[in-house]
Amino acid sequence: MAEALRRVLNAGCAARPGEDGAAGPPLLLLGAPRSAQTSLLFAAALEAAGEGRGSVLFVTRRPLQSLPLSTPTAREHWRLQKVRFQYPSSIQELLQLLASAHEAPAPTPSLLLLDGLEEYLAEDPSAQEAAYLAALLLDTAAFFSHRLGANGSCGLVVALETQKEAEADAPHLPLLKRYFPAQCWLQPDALGLGQHCCLRASLELGKLSPRTEWSVSFLPCGEMKVTPWLAQASKLSPEKKDSSAGSQSLTLGCDNLPGPGSPLDGILTSETGADSKT
């Protein structure tokens, strides 16, 4: 998953030499509430679905109310058909889903995504339960990788809401980092004033890996723009910042969302009526 997310943030660039078929290390996607974690997970799912290596398993507590992104890839039905959603409503249902993964007749996924880890851990906040769930997630991804064989490996990303990057503000973060060597932090980006939602995404693939950063902007119409984040950008005039960012931006279209004929029609309708995260 780390590689699928990196390619999303790198505007869909191809994998670097020697990385073809590599899923990358297990990754934690961290950010405050409403920091667009679901949107980035969905973008990574569509990216992986287009690689031709297998389906994508997207696990979340409740059905999405609508497509998190309005993008050209989100309107490609063949990509959407390769993303399979599962909605375990409790931590026990989640554990059962993972434990029975070897019995599932569905195609083996090349990417496993879990959204809203904090909601499941809230039911049993013990460190033992967090460690057990993390280990089971890794075991499930390893099992999928074994089944894929020569076709590649199964990536894993887990989204966890936390208020700050400080470990003291996330009780299980030090423990979870032992299982997930890669992390991507989503933080408010002060350089994005005037945008509907602007975040700074910081990606580290491991302790010895350099940190790579981007500015991610979401507009009301569903358009997402990604530009390299540069500390010196704060020293530029607004005109120069706009010019510099525009030359490297990824713009994902903001046309209307798919209509009733979309493969996700029905899947995206929540029976609970609860609001989904974006």
From Swiss-Prot:
Region (Disordered) location: 237-278
The entry's keywords: DNA damage, DNA recombination, DNA repair, DNA-binding, Nucleus
Compartments, record wording: Nucleus
GO MF annotation terms: ATP hydrolysis activity; single-stranded DNA binding
Bias (Polar residues) ranges: 269-278
GO BP terms in the entry: double-strand break repair via homologous recombination; protein stabilization
Major localisation: nucleus
GO cellular component labels: nucleus
Role noted for this protein: ATPase which is preferentially stimulated by single-stranded DNA and is involved in homologous recombination repair (HRR). Has a DNA-binding activity which is independent of its ATPase activity.
Subunit structure: Interacts with ZSWIM7; they form a functional complex involved in homologous recombination repair and stabilize each other. Interacts with RAD51, RAD51B, RAD51C, RAD51D and XRCC3; involved in homologous recombination repair.
Family matches, as PANTHER family: ATPASE SWSAP1, PTHR28653
Name under which the protein is recorded: ATPase SWSAP1
Organism of this sequence: Mus musculus (Mouse)
Gene: Swsap1
